[in-house]
Amino acid sequence: MITELRSIWKEAFGDSDVFMEDFFSVAYSKDRCRTLRRDGKTVSALYWFPVFEGGAKMAYLYGVSTLQEYRGQGLAAYLIEKTCKELQAKGYSGVLLVPGSEQLFEYYRKLGFFACTAIAEKCISAAGCIQLRPIEREEYAVLRRKMLPYRGVEQEGAFLELLERQYKLFAGDGVLLCAAVQDEQAFIPEFLGDKALLPAVAGALGVRTAQVRLPGQGRSFSMYRPLDGHRPPLYFGLAMD
């Protein structure tokens, strides 16, 4: 089963073996995975993480994928619809996902999703330095809850285990971030706190430039499908995309 799921994932997304090993060792659960079989094999799959906004439990759908030779038959759409009904019966208030392209935004609109959050993306040049301290995911979760923007989505548990495998987690005076550093550039998929400190944060990471995702107006990022009428969130930051 896992071998089949890894094959589907690799063909659909091209992620590294290291990432797939991390995902299937710390984030995967058969209870949060749904599949379709055809011709004696698994051909389509999706996964989800439980997330929360305003006390409401939601699902972040992740890794929706179908083998190339079985695409165009509506399998993923069927699997999503079936999963949404199951999640609704389990008491989930809504479903979130992050499309990887404009074409996928259109695809998911046809399945009842609508764009609900946006992010701003900036390239920051290092200037100055502030003190950052590495932290573990448990502290990161506590601080993140306090610093999330209004109606932001809490993402914890297995998702943060996977995040910690892929990124370093840091806290400083008034800032919280996760970052991956390669050569002289950093990628910061989420930064919470005083944006004026970003140049000094880049300096603290020891890089010349940092690509940063920020809460705010920018490109559409996540989509939402309500299951019980609950309001859509206004911020969704960590996609692991």
Identify the meaning behind each predicted range.
Residues 66, 72-85, 110, 193-206:
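Conserved acetyl-CoA-binding loop-helix of GNAT-fold acetyltransferases
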Residues 111-189:
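Amide-forming acyltransferase catalytic core, primarily the GNAT-like/NAT-type
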